[in-house]
């Protein structure tokens, strides 16, 4: 939990002592008119309310030592917070704990499962959105104080993986990503002409579920090689996992059969199924082999043993699956754990859907490589004074951060189109724009002598606006954690940087009087810390020089 005084909650409690309102009726005013706004339309219209009641609320709020003023304005109460209070809260936290806001660890354990792509090929950019959202949620919840674990469910038992194994046995060659992918694409082309291949795959599925050592051992090697390729690409953009949970382990240790037996199943041609909203949902095939839905139930029961809150990041095409899964967990199995499904829209291309089976894909590796090449051109142009090695390191960090920011800044349910000219724009709404501001702050601090202990409090508008932008950081962090909305952090970062740029243009830091300098240098230090902290939540790595 974040250690800060949430003034929204404080003000909500003042109002709710007399009137029934929603916590959502008290919110940050992002218009710039005031700092906190309260909707009071219902209070004005209620029998025991009216204008006098609203004015009484205004007086109660105005008595708080952090309030500059409070006004009733057309169905709203607008509240202005003292900038001296805001600055003190930020600086005291940073000077005491080294960070703003400080935090203590929650007892609640959280599982964040993301990516979980079949290890049948490289990660395409549509699926990479899953990884970037999931990792950002993990970072946000960890920063908030939850004990969070990153999990990847390795689907090494499904039909696609058995198809990959069958292709390897059929066409041979080394167990390398290139050869396995070529064989995989080949078998799907051949399957369109030769229906007997389908029967081969079904036979191998049965052998696998019966723990045939030859099938199991070879397939584990194949899956491991493909998974290493996915993991190494994700690591390039700062994404790693705490656990790789293998689907086959749940089959071999009996967890899947146990999960099926916990349900009241019916049979049709020897295949077992359950009914959800009048529809049949099959758990096994007629030959007794299990289907993915059954294995996913078992996996969620496994996660529930170690986590009070289970979060799945899923493509929008998995909504029906998730709805059925949630029904099984909550209505049939009475699982008490909190379960959240976060859906996202895919990144689409003009060439249509991306499919590993047919080889028509743009991979995450392709995207990062191209972004790196474009970033390196810009760095070479702007910083010829640096060594080639330094320019390459900067370009790599810019590329990783640019890819992540360009994807995370768009709300998850909305479709996205990646454009390099936007991702690498140093002038607005991009990772380089944010990173350059951090480097600018670092440059000021490099030249700054040690300030006086005391500092003045008379601030011009640009400075006061920056103080407010820093102060509200924990509000955005709290909302992003509770609502699972990492795009809120992306929006906050841009707003914060814009306020710093206004401050930088209007307010001299070095060369002012001692009290003003002492305050402003502390503000710049605090800004640099908060910017770095918030950037890390969505995978932006800051640089001291660009």
Swiss-Prot record:
Instruction: Give yes or no: UniProt keyword Aminoacyl-tRNA synthetase.
Output: yes
The UniProt record lists the EC number as 6.1.1.19
Entries under InterPro entries matching the protein: Arg-tRNA-ligase, Arg-tRNA-synth_N_sf, ArgRS_core, DALR_anticod-bd, Rossmann-like_a/b/a_fold, tRNAsynth_Ia_anticodon-bd
Cite the GO molecular-function annotations of the record. arginine-tRNA ligase activity; ATP binding
Checking SUPFAM superfamilies in the record gives:
Anticodon-binding domain of a subclass of class I aminoacyl-tRNA synthetases, Nucleotidylyl transferase
Which Pfam families does this one have?
DALR_1 (PF05746), tRNA-synt_1d (PF00750)
Query: Which residue windows are transmembrane per the record?
Result: none
Question: Where does the protein end up?
Answer: Cytoplasm
- An annotated GO cellular component: cytoplasm
Q: Which domain of life is it from?
A: Archaea
The main place the protein resides is cytoplasm
Q: Per the UniProt entry, what is one GO biological process?
A: arginyl-tRNA aminoacylation
Q: Where are the disulfide bridges? A: none
Question: Motif 'HIGH' region: where?
Answer: 117-127
Q: Which SMART domains match?
A: DALR_1
Catalytic activities: tRNA(Arg) + L-arginine + ATP = L-arginyl-tRNA(Arg) + AMP + diphosphate
* Keywords from the UniProt entry: Aminoacyl-tRNA synthetase, ATP-binding, Cytoplasm, Ligase, Nucleotide-binding, Protein biosynthesis
Which family, according to the similarity comment? Belongs to the class-I aminoacyl-tRNA synthetase family.
- The name under which this protein is listed is Arginine--tRNA ligase
What gene is this protein a product of? argS
């Amino acid at each position: 939990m974040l250690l800060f005084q949430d003034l929204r909650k404080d003000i909500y409690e003042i109002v709710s002592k007399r009137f029934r309102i929603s916590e959502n009726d008290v919110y940050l005013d992002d218009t710039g008119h005031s700092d906190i706004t309260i909707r009071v339309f219902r209070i004005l219209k209620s029998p025991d309310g009216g204008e006098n009641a609203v004015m009484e609320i205004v007086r109660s709020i105005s008595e708080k030592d952090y309030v500059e003023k409070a006004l009733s304005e057309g169905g709203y109460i607008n509240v202005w917070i003292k900038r001296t209070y805001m600055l003190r809260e930020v600086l005291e936290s940073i000077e005491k704990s080294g960070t703003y806001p400080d935090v203590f660890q929650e007892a609640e354990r959280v599982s964040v499962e993301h990516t979980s792509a079949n290890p049948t090929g490289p990660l395409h950019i549509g699926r990479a959105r899953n990884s970037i959202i999931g990792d950002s949620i993990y970072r946000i919840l960890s920063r908030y104080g939850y004990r969070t674990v990153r999990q990847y469910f390795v689907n090494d038992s499904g039909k696609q993986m058995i198809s990959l194994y069958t292709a390897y046995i059929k066409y041979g060659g080394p167990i390398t990503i290139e050869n396995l992918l070529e064989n995989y694409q080949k078998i799907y082309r051949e399957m369109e002409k030769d229906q007997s291949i389908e029967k081969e795959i079904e036979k191998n599925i049965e052998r696998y579920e019966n723990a045939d050592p030859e099938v199991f051992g070879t397939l584990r090697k194949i899956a491991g090689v493909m998974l290493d390729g996915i993991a190494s690409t994700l690591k390039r953009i700062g994404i790693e996992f705490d656990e790789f949970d293998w689907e086959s382990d749940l089959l071999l240790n009996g967890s899947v059969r146990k999960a099926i037996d916990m349900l009241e199943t019916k049979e049709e041609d020897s295949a077992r199924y359950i009914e959800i909203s009048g529809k049949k949902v099959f758990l096994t095939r007629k030959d007794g082999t299990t289907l993915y839905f059954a294995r996913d139930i078992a996996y969620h029961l496994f996660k529930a043993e170690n986590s009070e809150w289970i979060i799945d990041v899923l493509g929008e095409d998995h909504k029906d699956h998730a709805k059925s899964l949630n029904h099984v967990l909550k209505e049939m199995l009475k699982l008490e754990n909190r379960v959240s499904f976060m859906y996202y829209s895919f990144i689409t291309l003009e060439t249509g859907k991306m499919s590993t089976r047919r080889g028509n894909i743009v991979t995450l590796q392709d995207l990062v490589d191209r972004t790196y090449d474009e970033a390196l051109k810009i760095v070479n142009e702007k910083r010829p004074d640096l060594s080639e090695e330094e320019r390459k390191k900067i370009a790599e960090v810019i590329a990783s951060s640019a890819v992540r920011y360009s994807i995370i800044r768009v709300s998850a349910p909305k479709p996205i189109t990646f454009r390099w000219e936007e991702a690498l724009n140093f002038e607005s709404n991009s990772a380089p724009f944010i990173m350059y501001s951090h480097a600018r702050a670092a440059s000021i601090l490099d030249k700054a002598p040690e300030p006086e202990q005391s500092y003045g409090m008379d601030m011009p508008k640009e400075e006061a606006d920056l103080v407010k932008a820093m102060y509200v950081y924990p509000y955005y962090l709290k909302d992003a954690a509770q609502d699972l909305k990492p795009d809120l952090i992306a929006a906050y970062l841009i707003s914060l940087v814009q306020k710093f740029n206004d401050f930088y243009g209007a307010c001299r830091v070095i060369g002012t009087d001692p009290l003003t300098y002492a305050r402003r240098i502390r503000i710049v230090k605090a800004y640099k810390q908060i910017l770095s902290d918030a950037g890390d939540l969505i995978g932006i790595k800051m640089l001291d020089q660009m």
